[in-house]
Amino acid sequence: MADWVTGKVTKVQNWTDALFSLTVHAPVLPFTAGQFTKLGLEIDGERVQRAYSYVNSPDNPDLEFYLVTVPDGKLSPRLAALKPGDEVQVVSEAAGFFVLDEVPHCETLWMLATGTAIGPYLSILQLGKDLDRFKNLVLVHAARYAADLSYLPLMQELEKRYEGKLRIQTVVSRETAAGSLTGRIPALIESGELESTIGLPMNKETSHVMLCGNPQMVRDTQQLLKETRQMTKHLRRRPGHMTAEHYW
């Protein structure tokens, strides 16, 4: 049984009509950057719960979550309606293996995300530990519209902080936007446009690819890299070149 603790909302940041971030104070156990927990609310006499990744660094007591409101969802519209001072239930112990401990050494670490799945990477990069073993870091955030790139300012801050080691790139699929590539991640890899824009190759000799978000993006990218680059899924018992987390 999960141990639930009561958290208090300290901030609600509405990015768009559908995207928002919750900041919560709660007595949770220490977690590893990249992990997730569960948020819950009592609705009609039962606890409704969903898993959400931590966006904040583990050394930051402001627990931050990046969410999308599902119009007919049972929980997300209620979470979106919370105000500072409101209570929310949080599972105290985090879970998940989408962490740097599970990533083998390589020259270039590619971190590819769609939508709200940018969260785990922001936690990892804000903490900044265990990254010395990579020569290059690449963070790619794909969304439908430029307005959905909620954490671009933080991505730009991190890019400066890493002084040339971190390269960031945004992608939009439903419009063209300055500074963003247009299309979807698998197609941009297939065409070579993503690599030429970043200026680094994505291959099994130099790279490890982390994939987080839309299951279709994850599957399509894995299939493409397997077929065209001979890259394989990374398992503890059989080291490979791709680590993934589906976001629903």
Swiss-Prot record:
EC number(s) reported in the record: 1.18.1.2, 1.19.1.1
Localization in the cell: Cytoplasm
Effect annotated for changing R184A: Increases Km for NADPH. 15-fold decrease in catalytic efficiency
Taxonomic superkingdom: Bacteria
Residues noted as binding FAD in the record, renumbered to the chain: R50, A51, Y52, S53, Y66, K74, L75, S76, T116, Y247, W248
Cofactor: FAD
PANTHER family: FLAVODOXIN_FERREDOXIN--NADP REDUCTASE (PTHR47878:SF1), OXIDOREDUCTASE FAD/NAD(P)-BINDING DOMAIN PROTEIN (PTHR47878)
Protein name (Swiss-Prot/TrEMBL): Flavodoxin/ferredoxin--NADP reductase
Gene designation: fpr
